[in-house]
């Protein structure tokens, strides 16, 4: 048992942060390529002026035993994928020493999870403005949600997707907007496993695996999964190769012919 005051000993926290940093693959610094569009519209507003949307792709049929593509769901505009994602992570806030330590531990765990997705093939640019990001990671508990029994339930993490129409200098495209909430109050491994799972959703894995050894398992196993499994990576590779209208230029609805 650690001696009294051990958890408040600065050397312990320095060691913990250093260990997380060593385990964390590099993630790019804030990128000037992440800029907010001039305007974001709801898809309902876009529907009045845009050419009709092609039917969404059907869910994938079961592939080999090496992935779980058939458990993913596409959006009305296709599979949710981008060649590069702008990600904003809530920075460490000003506060007392204990709060600052908790925030740093949270940030280190999120950075580690983010780095593992980068190593698995996700291209990430760091945004220093949340409005410039497609993925925003917040240090807070997710909003309560009704469970199957109708009762409100709390959770440690959640990712929520919304599709919008983005416009800049006459160009328009469908842009995913993902809010990710990761609660504090977990150990470093619990934080990292939660962040890994929710970021997997954010990067397009909108579905769950039936294997507790996968980061995207519907029901976690006894040991936290701290990096994507080979099945997670295989499913991600399949997703990234699928066609999608998300991020591609949109055609405007043709103007009516004169006199009609």
Residue locations for each model-derived region?
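Disordered inhibitory propeptide/activation segment of secreted metzincin zinc metalloprotease zymogens
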Residues: 2, 21-101, 168-170, 259
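N-terminal secretory signal peptides that target proteins for export/translocation
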Residues: 1-7
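Divalent metal-coordination and catalytic microenvironments
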Residues: 117, 197-200, 216, 236
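Bacterial N-terminal signal peptides
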Residues: 13-23
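Metzincin-family zinc-dependent endopeptidase catalytic domain
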Residues: 104-198, 206-209
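Short, solvent-exposed loop/turn elements at domain surfaces
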Residues: 94-102, 145-148, 224-226
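Metalloprotease/metallohydrolase-associated module, dominated by Zn2+-dependent proteases
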Residues: 29-33, 37-42, 156-190, 206-260
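Tryptophan (W) side chains
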Residues: 7-9, 13
